[in-house]
Amino acid sequence: MTTKYNAGIHHRRSIRLKHYNYRSEGFYFITICCKNKECLFGHIINQQMQLNDLGNYVKQCWENIPMFFPQVRIDEFVIMPNHLHGIIEIIEQVKGKCNLPLQLRATQLPQKGTSQTIGSIVRRFKAGVTSWARKNSEIFDVWQRNYYEHIIRDEKSYLQIYEYIQNNPILWEQDQLYVD
């Protein structure tokens, strides 16, 4: 018997905005962290990120998100030893569960996930990385539960976040996720 989720019992609360449509066009700043802040993706050497095999696979999966979610554009991102920061742009709002013309839905294109929210994008990305890690390494749990997102509402915020992402390897030792 499975127990239905109950916030009072499970002590979890959503960190998402209650009435926000996470399919909406716009820019989103995403942070996804490794479980227990483990440094699984490589190391910072001379203020530059040196990716290991898993880190390179994370990079490949992140860059390939638009193949599975054609309404998404990948903007600036950085893979750090124990987390990823990235800007995702939704370039067109998805209407309903499928935004493809009827004649293309089941024939010419590979199957895509039905949900097109930021949450479904992150979920698919995390699942792909975890699956690869389990098959190709001794790592079983890659990610902490959930992810952090910030809706970028103006150019000033976008530019600050863009600069933060670019400087993240340089400022690694001051990062709140830094572990020695």
Curated annotation (Swiss-Prot):
UniProt-recorded Gene Ontology molecular function terms: sequence-specific DNA binding; transposase activity
Species in which this protein is naturally found: Haemophilus influenzae (strain ATCC 51907 / DSM 11121 / KW20 / Rd)
Database matches in InterPro entries: RAYT_transposase, Transposase_17, Transposase_17_sf
Name of the featured protein: Uncharacterized protein HI_0554
Top-level taxon: Bacteria
Cross-referenced Gene3D superfamilies: Transposase IS200-like
PANTHER family membership: REP-ASSOCIATED TYROSINE TRANSPOSASE
GO process terms (BP): DNA recombination; DNA transposition
SMART domains per the UniProt record, alphabetical: Y1_Tnp (SM01321)
